[in-house]
Every structure is written in C-alpha cells, then in structure tokens.
C-alpha cells in the first residue's frame, strides 16, 4: 500500500511540473468586451463607473459595442480612450461625414501597427467589425470587435455575418494571437454559432465549463429577463497557436454606490496565456 501511495505522489508531482513550467513561459493578455448602451440612462454617470473599472483592470485591449457620437455627444470610445491613454479605432457603417455615427470600437494602450474596419453583409443590417493589430511583449496581436443582428428570429442573418467575420479575420490577421470580442446577440449552442465555435474557443466557457446560464449571463435580467450569454470573447482553437484562456470574469454585475449600472449588458474580462 505504501509503495502504491509513493508511486501516486511521484505521478502527481510529475504532472504538476509541466503546468508550472508552462506558466513560467507564458505572458498574460487581458481582454475586455462591453456593450456601452450608447447614451442611455445617464451616460456621464455610467462613464465614471466604466472608467473606474477599466483603470482597475488595466486591460491590454477593450472591445466596445453600441458606441455613439452625434452633435451633442463626443464619440464615446474617444472619451474613454483619452481618459485611459489608449489608441481608439472606431468602426461604423455611418461615414465620417455623417453627424451621427454608431458602431464598434477597440481601445489599446499599446503601439498600433494596423487599424481598419469592414462592413458586414447583409448591408441592410448596418453592422461592422473593427480591427486593430498592436505590438505586445515582442509579439503582434490582432483584435476584432463586432456586434451582430439583434432579433431572436434573425439567426440566418447572424450566420451570414459570422461567415463574413471569419473570412475577414482570415484575410487580415497576422501571425500572432487573435482575440475577438463582441455582442453576438446569441448563445453558443445556437445554429448560427456553429462556424464560430468550430474555429474559436469561447473564453468564458473554456474557463468555466460548468457555470450555470445565470452565472455566465452577460445581459442584466433587470432590463430583460432570460436573455442569457450573448456577449463573448473568443480565441483560436488551434493548439499550434499556444494560446490558452486561464481566467474569465463577468464584470459590472452590480450597480455602483449611487445605484447606477454601467450598462444594460454586463462586461467580460478574460485573461489569455500566450506562450513565449
């Protein structure tokens, strides 16, 4: 019996060594996604709540949706970016000459190598994707932010948008890690997500495979019940990329001290181990 116990201890220690070695040879990329809820419900107060949390988290990249600018409101992503010292890439189907523009954005404090955008098909759904490649710890990281069609019956529209999103990522990415954040307006098990989940790992689901739907939910049930997990962070599935989700947390799940919610959505912060 003593011999078996000793052999078991040796096996456990042997298995533990590679994990510690892997952790020592990886850097951690911190990624946030959040639907800003445009200018609804006291934006100046919500802005303060969002800024405080982002300063605490110090993410390497932030993916934003429902970003608004109009003659009365400065571009919300630019307001955040200036306060945080970040580069801002804003993507909108509304041209730069338009007084009102609405879309997605990416913020990063790191040196930007590429920033661009693409409108998603179908054109009459007015959806876009933002793309930034930035330098990070001796590597190049490609980040994408998007927001898909919103109706429950619109699965076919979302499927088309996902096909175009995946093709766009394939045609624009570099050789480093890829992260995709956004409001997909659907959960992982829906038919329209099949392509996405065949190519990418959902960070929250990977880290918390046994979380209940309520625990993982990203839409505030006070605003609409039973929406579930519609905001996602994705990284690649391919083992050769050596990218591993190691942590994920739902953020903005509680109101601030003055009862102000950051958004009608909760946000996600994921930590991704990237092998050196």
PLM segments and residue spans:
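N-terminal, active-site-proximal structural segment of metallo-dependent hydrolase catalytic domains
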Residues: 13, 21-83, 90, 96-100, ...
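Metal-dependent phosphoester-hydrolase catalytic domains
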Residues: 133-135, 170-179, 186-276
């Amino acid at each position: 019996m003593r011999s078996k116990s000793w052999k078991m201890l040796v096996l456990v220690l042997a298995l533990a060594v590679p994990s510690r070695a892997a952790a020592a040879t990886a850097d951690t990329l911190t990624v946030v996604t959040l639907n800003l809820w445009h200018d609804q419900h006291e934006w100046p107060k919500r802005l303060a709540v969002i800024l405080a949390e982002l300063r605490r988290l110090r993410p390497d990249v932030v993916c934003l949706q429902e970003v608004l600018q109009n003659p009365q409101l400065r571009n919300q992503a630019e307001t955040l970016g200036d306060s945080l010292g970040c580069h801002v890439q804003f993507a909108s189907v509304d041209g730069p000459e338009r007084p009102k523009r609405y879309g997605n954005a990416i913020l990063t404090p790191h040196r930007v190598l590429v920033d661009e955008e693409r409108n998603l098909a179908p054109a009459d759904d007015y959806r876009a994707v933002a793309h930034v490649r930035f330098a990070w710890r001796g590597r190049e990281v490609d980040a994408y932010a998007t927001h898909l069609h919103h109706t429950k019956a619109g699965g076919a529209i979302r499927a088309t948008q996902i096909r175009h999103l995946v093709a766009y990522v394939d045609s624009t990415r570099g050789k480093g890690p890829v992260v995709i954040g956004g409001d997909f307006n659907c959960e992982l098990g829906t038919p329209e997500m099949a392509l996405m989940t065949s190519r990418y790992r959902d960070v929250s689901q990977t880290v918390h495979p046994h979380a209940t739907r309520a625990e993982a939910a990203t839409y505030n049930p006070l605003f609409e019940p039973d929406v579930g997990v519609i905001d996602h962070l994705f990284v690649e599935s391919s083992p050769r990329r050596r990218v591993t989700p190691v942590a994920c947390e739902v953020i903005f799940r509680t109101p601030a001290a003055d009862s102000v919610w950051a958004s009608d959505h909760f946000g996600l912060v994921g930590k991704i181990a990237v092998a050196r």
